[in-house]
């Protein structure tokens, strides 16, 4: 997979690049996988986790202030920061290291209107079209910082999301990550599609 980081979210972008360059993410697990929702990783405790060990509480000892940007939303392939819940984190500050990649689902106009009514959200025509065609998780918009997106290899999300999981949505077979920063990467031209 190749992920593009957004310049509109500089704190998250810079932190992610630092952790990738430091090798922090190498050999960590995608420890929480929910089909039709997302795949989550980045827990530093997952590197040497025993089979069946509960994960998700590990962190770097700091958070990142939320960077909510209109136009950056939870479409399929979005890279977003995990965080603690509103009850202990009303500022919606992001985890210093945990992240997720959105798989999501296709949303009809009626389903999207239900989300708007229930959560008091309003989606743009572009968002509605995206959620109706490629899918995503619109109910997370404005609650978690989206700071990048998959630009190549999005099918890997589907493959990981399809693995068999046990308690706490942890894959029964470890799914490890390895990351590096690509310099001078030329994004593929998808205008022909």
Residue ranges and their predicted role:
Residues 1-193:
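Cyclophilin-like peptidyl-prolyl cis-trans isomerases
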